Amino acid sequence: MLFLVVSTPRPERPSDLAKTRQSFWPWIANYQARGVCRHAYARVGRGAVAVFDVEGNNALHRILNEWADIIPAHFDTYPLVDVEATKRMLAAQVAAKKK
């Protein structure tokens, strides 16, 4: 299952958490190396976004709890559909309409 996660850190001063924040990138790199995190980007100003490919909600829940231990934040999560799956669904809809 694909999920887009948008983090909005708590309003602490960024400089107060700089040392802790440095550990985020090696942590997320571990998930990238395993193919669990497909993309990760810092947001302008504060926060980050990432696309995760996980087995289900429990796996995502575990990852977000780990993330929050590094950088306390609010997370907006959006389930995504793979492009190829979307193309197949649209083709099936077109084929069904022709019948």
Predicted features and spans:
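Conserved, structured core segments of small domains
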Residues: 1-99
